[in-house]
């Protein structure tokens, strides 16, 4: 593997220095991180020719395991989802192509590890198959002798059957103890997870996440070891960690859980997740940075904080606006639900989403949500509800913690946590209304309109920076969404989303 060209290195250095240098130093332009803003944790990526595919943990959101496609590694479009039913909290998938088939291996928390397959990443994906093995974060690898293995958290692996659809009992073994985190570093502990196995040239590389995925800002990291054989022994890189947050003042916190990926012309990148400093409740976002393989066969970074500045684009950019199609209510691609959901409840026709009401509040009504990913935004929708239904907007962490505004026969409702809403009588018995929620850098406020033109601000607001995993656990984020509770139907139309300064 050759070193990066002098031109490429010069471009990277110039861009790192606050983009000092003409655009000609980056022939395809530049990109800034994140490449997927918002809650897209535990990224796994695969290249098939000139096409890239990626998926992430979906946790308690359903449909799960959205598959993304890109031609340039920067702009991503959702193309399918691999899980149609709710199995539980889905963790740390791995998407790979073995032979002519695509596989996604994944963990269902407190249950087992599973696999789904498809002939193309566009689906359809198979029903999930139980692999009958514990641990988390599965990653398949096929040895030089053709034996299939499944690598797991804690530096362990287990044999797979020839078809890759089950594990072989009695073959679980530990192959690497992980990189020893230096004394004095502030982390959550070793927490070795997220194994990714790649063969480049004559070397097998074991890429692992360590340090804990949340906790203090300096917790997470990417460590690498290598071996001439999948059987080991594994030699640790003298340049570990490849990715890490060193300072609390950095923009990106808890950087880790990396996957290596190459371009057709032999350049290398790593995708991983990180929290944004001060915005934990956006979730772990997906970042991309270039790396290189030195003459001694070790992976190297271009700089400690290269991800904070514009970076030379790897390929000709093909922009895609992820928010542009929210008004189409594409369930499973742009929109999802919290935990189990009956798909027969939803119908989309001529730009109108009709939801069958259920439950009594956002806590048990399975809100329909999307990933905003912006520090400040507002969203609004026109609502037409049956008299027995309660409808509204939320920014939702889980069934206990959410913020929002609804409308029922009793008037306007303010939703906060899992408590009953506070009512304003001025909108009593209104069935047709426009609602808007604004999240202005974690200060949430609500607005309503009776004609879609004249808006009035409601008399409440709340600060939501504490609504995050380090407080509430569950690895969720604050997602904007729609609620239909009570009895009857709610019709949502004219949905709008705006990013704010």
Regions found by a protein language model. Name each.
Residues 19-501:
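Carbohydrate-active catalytic/glycan-binding domains of CAZyme proteins
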Residues 1-8:
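Bacterial N-terminal signal peptides that target proteins for export
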